[in-house]
Amino acid sequence: MLSKLFVFLLICYATADEVDKKEAKHGFQLFHWNWDHIHKVYVITTWLLVASLAKILFNLMKPLSKWLPDSSLLIIVGLGLGYFLNQTTLSGVHLDSHAFFLYLLPPIIFDAGYFMPNRALFKNFDSVLVFSVLGTLWNTFAIGGSLLIMSKYQLFTMPFTTFEILVFSALISAVDPVAVIAIFEEIHVNEFLFINVFGEALFNDGVTVVLYQMFKSFALIGSENLSPWDYATGGLSFFVVALGGAAIGIIFAIATSLATKYTQGIKILAPVFIFLLPYMAYLTAEMVSLSSIIAIAVCGMLMKQYIKGNITEAATNSVKYFTKMLAQCSETVIFMFLGLSTLTSEHHVDFIFIGATLVFCLIYRAIGIIVQCFILNKFRAKKFEVVDQFILSYGGLRGAIAYGLVVSIPASIQAKPMFITTTICVIYFTVFLQGITIRPLVNCLNVKKKEHREATMVESVYNKYLDYMMSGVEDIAGQRGHYSFIENFERFNAKVIKPVLMRHEKRQSFDATSIIRAYEKITLEDAIKLTKVKSTLQNKRLEKVKSEVRVAPEQTTVTPKDVQLARFMQSGENIDQLYTLFSDLLDKKLNELKVQADKVDKANDDDIQDDYMAEMGSHSNLGFMHHSADQLDSDSVFQRRGRRLSTGDLKGHCGTSRKPKHSMFELRHV
């Protein structure tokens, strides 16, 4: 036994010595090639760098970027990259569905939820809910049923079952919020149309994923193995998954707000909670098989108004920029992978299936929008016009969500290559053809555009006033509409939610709305004025009594300065010189204010806005501000002897030989 152990140790020593000698032959190397150690991270970084440089190049090419959306340009870059990879040994590069749903999709949905204009969404919540839920159900079953009927006549080259085609019809019904935002922000449609298209695209994705998962489970089980209980459970899961995802989003929104509330001692940690907790909401929903898209979208929407009161302005801007950066990187990678997969993925081209899918997508979306708008118009004050219905039908762009779902179809489904090819063709059709032509159509149909100006203070106050007035009308009529719900929520928000979730908010024992507070303030000021008037009248009566008692009134003393000033005021030339001096000073001050406003506008114009509504009008507001400043400069006036005179008129007037006489009162009045 000892001899065997000795032989083993001897062999190990000899082998080690031989290896050391072999390594020693090469000697010391100054540089080492460690590609295997860093190649994955390096490829990802290079990918993002190429995509970012491509977007910069597109932005510099104004004629090209004016007509082609960014998404279509990135797909073109992906096509070029795919052709290059096909000529090399890296032709197997593809987008993994696991990476898509866990790393690329969450930043996009969080960005859409965080920058969602909540007030506009709630005012149109009925239409958004109808379009995203009922519209998605209609498109899924209509497209799937039509393709299934055609397959019975053996018109397609690959067979599929009922649930397999429903899996495909569910994913092809997903309207992409990325493509919708990119297109509709550029054409500056009105807020009513934008919020309906954007809201539908966001929540439509959550509904689509729920349907997709349900039909995929049915397809894997097999229709012959399904029982009525399975169908009932699947239908119930549609509501459980959606509402459960929303509940998780609410819980994590509260957790994020509370976490940021107590970070005043360590402010650097606040942005960490803002990004980690929503992502944990997404992962938690995935873990328990609930809607992760709805979870992170709801979390972003709800936490925004509370975390702004808990963090500094600099931290708020940092959060906005980092959110946008993550979303832009994810969108860029996804669209480039769309172009790449055209040449690198396994395809099965069936022209009849592709053509039928395109036609059914267009026809059934138009039918669904028309019918839903017809029903909604019977119960809405703000009606959907014919032009609005056309843009809603034409704006159903497909994109990243549909592609991510189709590549995650199980390999056991035989028709998967045909589904992938058809999905890519539908995405290309909607992004390129519809995305390019929607701008000319909007201009041709005279679709109402967003007003490129900020609301005045009076408009803001009266908009709030109208909301409360409508709430009062609903209360008098004995009805409970969304105006009453808004009032009740704002009251509950001020009394309970804000004091709990925000740092410097105190519990309010009354309805602390701006209108009521303004009314109470005015009433209090009127009472104070009446008290002062009463006190003044009493003082005047006392002074009158005292003056009657006086034997000799006091004489007013005239100082030498008063005499000198009176002589100066009697000269007309001096008055004209004063006008000239005031005019020059005013013009100089206006120019300084204009230059300062230009600097502020240039600094703030490219800044990220709080939501997508503000982003649509940010660039146009700059021109409006410049026009207002110019108008103020040209219309600046003095009041002289009851006449309006511009500063230019004053300069010309001061050069005349007319020398009017002015009293001290008139100069002070000026």
From Swiss-Prot:
Tissue expression per record: Expressed in hypodermal cells of the main body syncytium, ut1 cells of the vulva and the spermathecal junction cell.
Glycosylation sites: N310
Chain segments carrying region Disordered: 648-670
Post-translational modification: Phosphorylated.
Stretch forming the signal peptide: none
TM stretches of this protein: 41-61, 73-93, 97-117, 129-149, 164-184, 192-212, 235-255, 268-288, 325-345, 351-371, 390-410, 418-438
Family: Belongs to the monovalent cation:proton antiporter 1 (CPA1) transporter (TC 2.A.36) family.
Protein name: Probable Na(+)/H(+) antiporter nhx-3
